[in-house]
Amino acid sequence: MTAIRGGSRRAPGLALALLGGVLLGACHGDENAQVNALPGFVSGSVRKTAYDGASDDLLTAGLGKTGLGSDTRPGFANPAQPSAAELRRLAIYSNYRALVDITPNGGYGRFWGPNVDLAGNDTLGEGKIAGTEYLAYSDDGSGRKNVTLLVQVPASFDPANPCIVTATASGSRGVYGAIAAAGEWGLKRGCAVAYNDKGGGNGAHEIGTGVVTLIDGTLATASSAGSSSLFTASESSSTLAAFNSAFPNRYAYKHAHSQQNPEQDWGLVTLQAVEFAYWALNEQFGPVVDGTRHGIRYRPGDITTIAASVSNGGGSALAAAEQDTRGWITAVVVGEPQINVRMTPGVTVEQGGAPVPSFGRPLADYATLANLLQPCAAAAVAATGAPYLSALPMGVTQSIRTQRCATLAAAGLVSGADTASQASDALAQLYAAGYLADSDLLQAPMWDSQAMPAIAVTYANAYTRSRVTDNLCNFSFATTNPVTGAVAAPAVSPMTNLFGAGNGVPPTNGINLVFNGASGGVDHRLATPDASFAGAFCLRQLWTANQLGIGTNVDAVRVAANLQHKPAIIVHGRSDALVPVNHASRAYVAQNSATEGRASQLSFYEVTNGQHFDAFLSVPGFDTRFVPVHYYDEQALNLMWNHLKSGAPLPPSQVIRTVPRGGVPGAAPALSTANLPPIVQSPGANAIAVNAGVIDVPL
């Protein structure tokens, strides 16, 4: 690994200014620069590492298709002190497997995977890809933002036909978070891949020890790391010590506790990742101008650049395309984007010619409502037979559902004299809030898996700019006793491998979501018979009563759905119960048609039987009912590539009517093309009508 020095943290522009007029002219924003220079937002040094494509590589970290598919995760020579290379390998392994179905029957190795080429054929062997990585922080000079930027340049990159694909992390994952969702496709296409962690990045601070993570996942104390940490809680050491005394074994997380509302900058940092990629490509392929420095070979707009990713990363790509004023982005392809749309009067979402009950709500609204109601709605008749996605005994989960319904009823929040009727009313309220009946069997697993509670707590903290010491709504993040759920000291600190195994949103890697009640902190599911209803109700009230500045901070993350006439594709599963399609993609497409009118080049593909987490598709009940949305994300990328390179028309907006695999839960037959009809140029009755602010999706 080599280091390329960047700017000073105290004054990022000073070092560049001292180098003289020619180099100063190459700084961020100068379209006429002749010398390649790091953008002004790059803080500290750039780490450059070459990978041979055998012992280590860009896509699989040397594991290959077989290693990524193995249930045995890569280990460490010294478990107490893993190296940066070992942590990187584990991060690539964990993040790849977190976004796709990794089972052969589910499509791995057949429809996707390192061995599968872009035509869908098994021709690439273990699929290792040689190339170079560039790693650095983006910062605003404060040393507290520290967004991780990473550029991978494959050895197959053709300087005469350059391309970039963005792979902004999904969720709150680290910088490799979208390696399976967008990075893999870009690397196979021979494109540079521009990653960033969105300023969340799995950064944590262990309050009791003061240990924090660095850019490469290795650890340091907050005092020794200084401004080089991925994240350090902003409170003083004395305040944190007092907090630790009252609430031991707690953790601060960057997305939740940075007090920066990082989502408001997700579009900006995605653009910065692209600009950093331009710098890296000029550094690698630009002419040498004075024996040491490189000239400018590529200027904004010279490189075919597709902004791509899924979930939060997909929303970031859309936001970046809207904010692009310099021609960095050529086109957009995103899957299941989590996006908060600023809706204007007259915009409408319809299904089957009838207006849907609700659309375009922000995540802060629908997530806090779902977190409150889902444990009760899970007991509804319509949810019978839902996949079970919890480590708790079924009896405990059933008790939680009954007690949550009873507490909701006592509070006047649901009606009904018994659990069945209360659950039916809870589900009806979710329908009224824009959830589809297609998601009925997903309401239970979204809460049981703790996906929805995790999101409700993390985003409420972010949108209120809360500190870890605030214990917002009496929730915090802590290690717990695996039997009782009570807060307890860990046998081994989860910080050691957090960079490699964590996902940035507790519960993750042994750090759990706890409710701080009268008896101390306990796993939120077990803290009270109704699974911490008081905390869930508090989170809901933050939104409904517009408390602690939540409305202002949510407004800061809304987008206008103006893609500036860039060609774009959105893919979304109709059954998505985490990011409901009515509030995200359908709302975005409708608003885009009002904003851009006939100049819009946006196509929307809605996938029946598609849901948010392809990694769940191997779970019994998921395997028989749901199909991989990732398959269509890759098809959409190929369609966009052909559109940009050969002028092939993008297929119009349409519903893709997939066929579930069926069979016995846990033993569904192998996925085949019979389950996955293609995106077509003439969708007929499956066409989605979009015009003048109105979207009408066929039933």
From Swiss-Prot:
Chief place where the protein resides: secreted
Function in brief: Participates in the degradation of poly-3-hydroxybutyrate (PHB). It works downstream of poly(3-hydroxybutyrate) depolymerase, hydrolyzing D(-)-3-hydroxybutyrate oligomers of various length (3HB-oligomers) into 3HB-monomers.
EC number assigned by the record: 3.1.1.22
Protein name as it appears in the record: D-(-)-3-hydroxybutyrate oligomer hydrolase
Signal sequence range: 1-33
Keywords of this entry: Hydrolase, Secreted, Signal
GO MF annotation: an example: hydroxybutyrate-dimer hydrolase activity
Reactions performed catalytically: (3R)-hydroxybutanoate dimer + H2O = 2 (R)-3-hydroxybutanoate + H(+)
